[in-house]
């Protein structure tokens, strides 16, 4: 009986905490890692973007699905987690390692991995709190399709240096937009 009461009390406290917090507080280092990842990505540039103009492509970043002004606060963590996971997957592929300075690539991927750990910790706290809204599922699917287009592009271009430069610049813009999503977390509703 005592165990049942303790269990019910724990559930009550957890549901109260999660309804009040809409997720969790990311460590202060999360923002710093995001800024550092942007800096590292800029330093990874090997070619002038001007030399790769013929390779440019519009990957159709799903801005309307991940817009910091329109997205609900409860959706920010899952969307950021998906963005970070997709970027990490892209840059840890065997084809990626040949394109970049290994030291910069390792630092970049380590920062992304730490960010992903922070975000997944928050996601674990959200499990069972609420059903994901359909708009969140739409956002996650849009992010996956966006990165699928990038992967297909790299394959079509045979992972050429210019293709990777185009993708690096695109991912830099994507990470910049994730900084706006991070700012959304600290806003009052």
Swiss-Prot record:
Query: Can you tell me which residues are glycosylated?
Result: 101
InterPro entries referenced in this protein's UniProt entry, alphabetically: 4_helix_cytokine-like_core, Interferon_alpha/beta/delta
This protein's major location comes to: secreted
What are the boundaries of the signal sequence? Answer: 1-23
Q: Which gene encodes it?
A: Ifna12
Q: Which UniProt keywords apply?
A: Antiviral defense, Cytokine, Disulfide bond, Glycoprotein, Secreted, Signal
Q: What is this protein called?
A: Interferon alpha-12
SUPFAM superfamilies per record: 4-helical cytokines
**Subcellular localization, per the record?**
Secreted
Q: Write the lineage as a comma-separated list.
A: Eukaryota, Metazoa, Chordata, Craniata, Vertebrata
